[in-house]
């Protein structure tokens, strides 16, 4: 749920920076700067990657038959959230200061924000190793997942044991 909520918040931030790019006089200044890179990544990373993580954590008990370690899952979320914001938020300021996109080397005045962005990118990347550890631990074992581990999940897939057996429905299920 944390990844789903963060998706909404961060996608909204990306959307608001897109509104700034829709204003012609401002876009003239921001065009081809790191502000566009920050906007793009604030829409893309939460929109795709955070959504994938939210769905992976939702379906992991059904796929593996075991619950994941929630403490590790929360740690993964916070490391990803902080790393993503450290990586991409400073790019707004770099773009507003005039740092162009697609350059092999940047002026020294941009070094501090680029260092913060680099640290954030490494943190975000390293936190994905933790996600792999969570998945492997879940596959290897742990607390058994019930057929319906989440409150409110009422679809047909939640009526069968976890993990779902082959030939799940020998007879067509009754849909109410």
Task: List each language-model region with its residue ranges.
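Interfacial and helix-entry/exit segments of alpha-helical transmembrane bundles
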Residues: 1-18, 34-37, 42-46, 50-89, ...
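Core, highly hydrophobic multi-pass alpha-helical transmembrane subunits of bioenergetic inner membranes
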Residues: 15-16, 76, 92, 108-115, ...
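Transmembrane alpha-helical segments in integral membrane proteins
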Residues: 52-62, 124-141
């Amino acid at each position: 749920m944390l990844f789903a909520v963060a998706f909404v918040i961060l996608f909204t931030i990306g959307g608001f920076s897109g509104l700034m790019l829709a204003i012609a006089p401002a876009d003239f200044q921001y065009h081809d700067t790191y502000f566009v890179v920050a906007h793009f990544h604030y829409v893309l990373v939460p929109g795709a990657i955070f959504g994938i993580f939210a769905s992976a954590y939702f379906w992991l008990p059904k796929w593996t038959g075991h619950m994941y370690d929630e403490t590790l899952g929360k740690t993964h979320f916070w490391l990803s959230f902080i790393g993503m914001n450290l990586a991409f938020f400073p790019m707004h300021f770099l773009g507003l200061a005039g740092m162009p996109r697609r350059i092999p080397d940047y002026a020294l005045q941009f070094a501090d924000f680029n260092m913060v962005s680099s640290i954030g990118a490494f943190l975000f990347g390293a936190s994905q190793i933790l996600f792999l550890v969570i998945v492997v631990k879940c596959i290897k074992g742990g607390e058994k997942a019930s057929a319906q581990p989440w409150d409110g999940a009422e679809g047909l897939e939640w009526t069968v044991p976890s993990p779902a057996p082959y030939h799940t429905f020998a007879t067509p299920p009754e849909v109410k």
